[in-house]
From Swiss-Prot:
Cofactor(s) annotated in UniProt: Mg(2+)
Disulfide bond sites: C68-C222, C353-C370, C413-C417
Species assigned in the record: Escherichia coli O7:K1 (strain IAI39 / ExPEC)
Subunit structure of this chain's protein: Monomer.
HAMAP family: Rhamnulokinase
Function recorded in the entry: Involved in the catabolism of L-rhamnose (6-deoxy-L-mannose). Catalyzes the transfer of the gamma-phosphate group from ATP to the 1-hydroxyl group of L-rhamnulose to yield L-rhamnulose 1-phosphate.
Protein's UniProt name: Rhamnulokinase
Family, similarity comment: Belongs to the rhamnulokinase family.
């Protein structure tokens, strides 16, 4: 038997993990083993909301060292993280300033300023990326306007996965799928857009040419002295998750469900027409030149904050209590930017219900019910928008990522959307990360080949829509007339 051992470092906004994948060539089987899991989260430092990148790097190294201590020969390593955030370095490779998180308020008002000065349509035609107030375009403008004293010291700007790859290898890389999330990459040239960079205040010399997934960045030297290739995977975690989504045919949509919910479809061409602009659709880069035509939905961030504020530790018990409540008694628009990072999420949800003359969710289960129903209704809205954009309905929706373990939300989604839902794999970002590594090692031919492996090895669950459910009736009778606010458009 021929085996390959690949390690995926998968960093999300709330947690990170180092996973070992074992691929058996002859039977095309893939098994995952968690080596190290650790928490991630927002910190407050000098008035900014930041990431603790030193702690994350230590956790990554700890996980890699654990694999080596077991005597396992690692064939390659890949790193994926969330998008838009970056680390600045000087000529010696030392950090300049703080690793500020996208939920910081420093970008307030800058997206509107950019639209007024450059033109909303022109920005969209150049980048193809949705307007979100924390895009790197606006973060860099905030930095260069508010901290000009840092500019003379900056030599490089590395997005998060590229920064951690640099820390392991000493080599710099700017991976394409994650670079596209910045709203700074020109959709026609696949290179940094000089006009957008100029507005941001950044120097083009801070960036190297974006590279597509599949190249070897450099090597990490393990404690035993072996040099292990570090591969540029599809380093935006959603790009990796989509690679591992077992999409079957052109009528399949995906929903990457976690802190954020990303709903979309794959396309060989981007959608940058007026309809896409009005709907705030994004065209992020994917593997093999494909586009991830999708829309951001606030996702389980709302629930994560409620769990934290109410000190809830038993999520299955909460979901069971939630399931017993009637549907759609309280609904909000999860994509209202009031929910990006409020002081108190519970109070913000209650205020939104109060302002729309609804009953007020008070108990833990009522708050969770409000979130689940509201997400499912928004999923239905977005799926309809995407179908209209491309001129063809979808026949199935693949929900991947940690959120796909929530059977109640999966069923609500199926019922609200009126579509068959296939849940799994859970560790989609990790698997997609591994998939690119296996292609780089010449074990697999392409993404479609890898998806066949996922389909046969992953644990998938199907949810059939129930047209007689409460939420299905709500969609048919009431929700069709509801107006939803775009997320930060």
């Amino acid at each position: 038997m021929t085996f390959r051992n690949c390690v995926a470092v998968d960093l999300g906004a709330s947690s990170g993990r180092v996973m070992l994948a074992r691929y058996e060539r002859e039977c095309r089987s893939l098994t995952l083993r968690e080596i190290h899991r650790f928490k991630n989260g927002l910190h407050s430092q000098n008035g900014y909301v930041t990431w603790d990148v030193d702690s994350l790097e230590s956790a990554i190294r700890l996980g890699l060292n654990k694999v080596c201590e077991e005597g396992i020969r690692i064939d390659s390593i890949g790193i994926d993280t969330w998008g838009v955030d970056f680390v600045l370095l000087d000529l010696q490779g030392k950090r300049v300033g703080l690793p500020v998180a996208y939920r910081d308020s420093r970008t307030n008002g800058l997206m509107t300023q950019a639209q007024q000065q450059l033109g909303k349509r022109d920005i969209y035609q150049r980048s193809g990326i949705q307007f979100l107030p924390f895009n790197t375009l606006y973060q860099l403008r905030a930095l260069t306007e508010q901290q000009p004293e840092l500019i003379p010291h900056i030599a490089h700007a590395l997005l998060m996965p590229d920064y951690f790859s640099y820390r392991l290898t000493g080599k710099m890389n700017w991976e394409y799928t994650n670079a596209t999330t910045t709203q700074l990459v020109n959709i026609n040239s696949d290179d940094w857009d000089e006009s957008l960079l100029a507005w941001s205040g950044a120097n083009k010399a801070w960036f190297g040419h974006p590279t597509h997934p599949g190249n070897v960045i450099g090597h990490w030297i393990c404690p035993q002295g072996n040099e292990i290739p570090v591969v540029a995977v599809a380093s935006h975690d959603t790009a990796s998750a989509v690679i591992a989504s077992p999409l079957n045919g052109s009528r399949a949509a995906y929903l990457s469900s976690g802190t954020w919910s990303l709903m979309g479809f794959e396309s060989q061409t981007p959608f940058t027409n007026d309809t896409a602009l009005a709907a705030n659709i994004t065209n992020e880069g994917g593997a093999e030149g494909r586009y991830r035509v999708l829309k951001n939905i606030m996702g389980l961030w709302l629930l994560q904050r409620v769990l934290q504020e109410r000190q809830i530790n038993d999520l299955p018990a909460l979901i069971a209590a939630t399931q017993a409540l009637p549907a759609c008694r309280f609904t909000i628009n999860p994509n209202d930017d009031r929910f990006i990072n409020p002081d108190e999420m519970c109070s913000e949800i209650q205020a939104a219900c109060r302002e729309t003359a609804q009953p007020i969710p008070e108990s833990d289960a009522e708050l969770a019910r409000c979130i689940f129903d509201s997400l499912a209704l928004l999923y239905a809205d977005v799926l309809h928008e995407l179908a209209q954009l491309r001129g063809e309905d979808f026949s199935q929706l693949h929900i991947v990522g940690g959120g796909c373990q929530n059977a109640l939300l999966n069923q609500l989604c199926a019922d609200a959307c009126g579509i068959r839902v296939i849940a799994g794999p859970v560790e989609a970002s990790t698997l997609g990360n591994i998939g690119i590594q296996l292609m780089t090692l010449d074990e697999l031919n392409n993404v479609d080949d890898f998806r066949q492996v996922v389909s046969t090895t992953a644990n998938l669950t199907t949810f059939t829509p129930n047209p007689d459910s409460e939420i299905a009736h709500y969609v048919a009778q009431i929700h069709s007339t509801r107006q939803t606010k775009e997320l930060c458009a």
